[in-house]
């Protein structure tokens, strides 16, 4: 992708990666992505962010098509994740005169990301400014946990543009770089929501704070680090509202308690039903959802476990362990926002019964509010086991 002019003396110099299908191990990217970076020309020339290290050569050529790299004065690192900072060390080798600007956390991170002891990095704070001449003054706003502790926004009020790095971005490879030129809008909208879910949903209070910063500005453009640039005539307002809607806490007087389970021969399922009945006997108005997880899409289960008020996990023990679908679901728990959420586990076993102790241990490591040590029975639940399972559900409900 060649350099693209956004406004007079402001250019997109990032690169496309249309073949990317998995990002950061955790996220599918069906439509590829872009690593966006920006160049502002003034009396001082400024780069905003770099790109993934594998794409440095293309990135450098895009810069060269606008200015000589030796004339770059500053590189602003809004966020130091390697897909944005990965080319900084090599850029420094080509342009050793550069001065880097980052948040205080970013300054610390860059030392160990670049391993360049002589790299000049200055930390800024909210409302600090950088006058680059020609009537352009960059203003900084620290925006922690959007989505790293180092994140910040760079704002050019004179040109009504905010550079927000990952915030409001999307893994969507649009070569024409503007939201008004998106060809497959439903696919973009799907990717936009998936990006929020994977990257920003753990940080909803910080998302709201970031939106408040942007809402106080008169903006024609929001230039993100992935996906098309958001424009006033395009999706800028709608994208902000979508993030605000997704980050608003849903108030409900009805507790949502899903029971996730898998059951090889129906014995763990029997326990699941009795525990549910026990919970219902105490919390009559609770929404208790029974979920045999092999029949559901993982992304749906992940959303449920993270939005619920409390949950139970049921698994038999097979080959001295819990079953993979349960471990996969546990891997989807948002440890940031699920801290102290009531949870427990149950299951039938036939030989050694390690599954439930393992699951309980992991839930404790995630800092959930774990009820007792779970509940188990040997093979087929007896009448006494069924009564105890019901009581376990009752007691769990009382603990919520």
From Swiss-Prot:
* Residues engaged in binding Fe cation 1: 79, 81, 147, 166
Broadest EC class assigned to this enzyme: oxidoreductase
Ranges for domain Flavodoxin-like: 257-397
Cofactor binding: number and manner = Binds 1 FMN per subunit. Binds 2 iron ions per subunit.
Query: What are the inducing conditions?
Result: Up-regulated upon exposure to O(2). Repressed by PerR.
EC number(s) reported in the record = 1.6.3.4
Residues bound to FMN are 263-267, 345-372
Residues that, per the record, bind Fe cation 2: 83, 166, 226
Please describe the quaternary structure of this protein: Homotetramer.
Q: Copy the domain comment.
A: Consists of an N-terminal non-heme diiron domain and a C-terminal flavodoxin-like domain.
What protein does this entry describe?
Flavo-diiron protein FprA2
Q: According to the entry, what is the taxonomic lineage of the organism?
A: Bacteria, Bacillati, Bacillota, Clostridia, Eubacteriales
